[in-house]
Every structure is written in structure tokens, then in C-alpha cells.
Amino acid sequence: MSDVENQPFFNIQRVYLKDMSLEQPNSPAIFLEQDMPSVEVEVDVKADRLAESVFEVVVSGTVTAKVKDKVAFLIEAKQAGIFDIRNIPDEQLDPLVGIACPTILFPYLRSNIADAITRAGFPPIHLAEINFQALYEQRLAQLQQQAGAAAGAPNGTTLN
């Protein structure tokens, strides 16, 4: 093999909106409310290996806005990307898939969610940037904690 074939390789094959849903259970009455909504945002990242060097990474976002305990809207969206990643050492592959890929996808997710909110008749909500490295490190710490708890469980049982 030549040196070119062994060079680290990272390529975005495709970025796409995998799923999106919008619910407005209290419209049109909710449009008459004068109070500002409270907004909750949840984000998650999942990755699947599709082939030896091809990964699908999905950043999921859920935005719930409430006015006086009434749901104004609920948006769930999944922004996905297919990435071709080759000749990356195993110890660097997981952080690349868990940090770099979601960082690439999140602006698309944020834009799609903001567009859906305004098209639904609500004032724009702009999601803040997310530190995917901190999210990744937090997930690793949780996995290590779970592994440690499972290793300490008597008779091979796992703790929940």
C-alpha cells in the first residue's frame, strides 16, 4: 500500500434531516397568551457503523415550550450525517464520531428547528451552541461509573 492509502481520511458523504415532528396541542388558544414561554431543550447523539469505514451519526433535539403549564409546541428532530472515516487510530475514532461529527451536524439541526418554530407561528427561538466535547466526556464518565458499579455487584448481577 502506498502512503496515500494509509493517510487519515475524513469525509462528509451526506447531511440530511432524518426525522422531524411538530405538535401544537393548545393552538390556537395558546396564541392569545401574553406570557413568555419557558423553553426546555434536550439533545442526544447516537452513532452507528454502516460499513467498515462508514458511520451514521444522528443528533436528536427536543424543544418543548410551555406557557403557564400549557404546551405551546413540542418539536422533535433528528439531523443525521454519513461520514467516511478511514485510517484513524481506534483511540481517536470514538471522540471523532462523538465530538467532531455532532459539532458539524448541530448547526443544521438548529436551523431546521428554528425554521419549524417560525413556520408554526411562534417567535424565533435560537438554540445555544453545545459543547459536544463536554457532553462526550460526561457520557464516558457515566459509562465508567456504570461499569464500576456492575463490576462491584455480587454474584454477577448488575445494578440499575
Swiss-Prot record:
One of its GO terms (molecular function) is unfolded protein binding. One of its GO terms (biological process) is protein transport. Keywords: Chaperone, Cytoplasm, Protein transport, Translocation, Transport. The keyword RNA-binding does not apply. It is found in: Cytoplasm. Its main location: cytoplasm. Gene3D superfamilies: SecB-like (3.10.420.10). It comes from the Bacteria. Pfam families: SecB. InterPro entries: SecB, SecB-like_sf. GO terms for cellular component: cytoplasm. Homotetramer, a dimer of dimers. One homotetramer interacts with 1 SecA dimer. One of the proteins required for the normal export of preproteins out of the cell cytoplasm. It is a molecular chaperone that binds to a subset of precursor proteins, maintaining them in a translocation-competent state. It also specifically binds to its receptor SecA. HAMAP family: SecB. Belongs to the SecB family. This is Protein-export protein SecB.
